[in-house]
Amino acid sequence: MPSILTDFNVRPYEDVPAQIIELSVPDAAAPKHCPIQLLYWPVEGKSNFIRGYENLKDGLSRLLADVPVLVGRLERGSKGDPRYLAVTISSDASVELEYEDISADDTIASYDDLVRNGFPTTGFKDIVSPKMSLGPMVEGSPMMCAKLNLIKGGAILAYGFSHVLADGWANSELGRLWALHAAHVSQGIGFERQKAATPDDEIRRQLSTLPDFDADAPLDAFLQITPSEEATNFLHKDVLAAEKAKKKAREKMMATLLAAGEVPELPRFTFWRFTPEKLKELKQAATSSDASKWISTMDALAGLFWSRIARIQGQSSNGHQQSRCIFALDIRRRLQQPVPLAYVGNVFSPVDAICPLDELESDSLGLKAAAQSMRQANKGWTQPRWEAWLNKIMSLPLDQTLDTSQEFRLQKHNMYFNDYSAFQLNTASWGAPFGQPARTRCLRSGLAGGAAGVWVCPKFPDGSLEVWLTSTAAIQKSLFEDATFNRYAEFVCQYT
């Protein structure tokens, strides 16, 4: 009988029959990557760590029985078309939950040092990540991967679900379910399905049945037709092909930056914390005196980063008249035929907010203008616009697809915004001995230049939010010195 610390394979708690699950059109349009979450816990003694690992394995086994598609592998569908994808599940399928003791590695900070420094992830990626997550997603890739790491005084769980299977909301729900199953294992509670039943096949057909559209209709300005093999949503046959395409796309991006006079640099990642009191003050400052122009706290938060970064850069004098902020909307409840929140799949729509740069850069108008632009973009979403995006992808020749335009990505006055505040990673308990994570992080790459990226992390139990910014060193330095920004934000940590 193999040791639990050498046998990483986890099989479903109940038998899962061999099957092929055809995915939806929105799944096929999703980026082909596996975002990795990091969960940190303090752990005393290796015996507690091993007990926690056993609970995670048993909890994962129950999760796989609860959501069988997680045990499958990504393939092209029956049509052999890279835009029609499927998950193949074999009768002996399993998922790896790796384990590694890196507590003796002097290059890895101790848990106490991580706490003291705000939980930076410098130098972590290649060491703590599951092996499967370090390469590109290709045909045959698993639907999830996970690894538990023992460090000095603590543990780090690194896991991810394929974006082809799970958008942001579904990713959060899967993490919550795994935590719940692990907690039940630690409490000696027998297996019970925790995922609400959903008619998945019916929902996928619904999401893939798109109305006729005008093939010549103009595209959203932040999209462009691009060679399929260079796009983020293309499924390559193997790692070699994927790496070759990635290298080509990166070389093209670098050449464009250099031609524009930019000096490519390693992106910097900075975390800022906003307390409930500061969030309330920020929303008040971003709210217009016009009662009809209500905004959310998230509109205000996006508006703060968007307006201050624009003011720092002063790009309007260089010929740009407006700025765009791209974000993703979960549209499960906004579709004419709503999709249950428990559905695991992609039901998101890319949206762009637009704001004149002369307003955005204004000390008196910038915050309110940016927040209101975010609100109007949210309110202005329509189902036909989302359907046109998917229809265009499916109607193009096989060697073409839609992707975010390089022009958008490489213009410094634009911004990406991602709201994960509703995720429950910081509040879910994984049972004894781990319990509730002390902190969560997400491993992402950043551009060597161009648009800044803002990620709002899962909310803390006290209502605080951490926000992660990826941008150039010059922007980060200017934000440290920006009185308006620092009125609301508290620095946590920074790394490259």
UniProtKB/Swiss-Prot annotation:
Keywords: Acyltransferase, Transferase. Its EC number is 2.3.1.-. One of its GO terms (molecular function) is acyltransferase activity, transferring groups other than amino-acyl groups. The active site is at H163. Pathway: Secondary metabolite biosynthesis. InterPro entries: CAT-like_dom_sf (IPR023213), Plant_Fungal_Acyltransferase (IPR050317). Acyltransferase; part of the gene cluster that mediates the biosynthesis of squalestatin S1 (SQS1, also known as zaragozic acid A), a heavily oxidized fungal polyketide that offers potent cholesterol lowering activity by targeting squalene synthase (SS). SQS1 is composed of a 2,8-dioxobicyclic[3.2.1]octane-3,4,5-tricarboxyclic acid core that is connected to two lipophilic polyketide arms. Belongs to the plant acyltransferase family. Monomer. This is Acyltransferase M4. It comes from Phoma sp. (strain ATCC 20986 / MF5453).
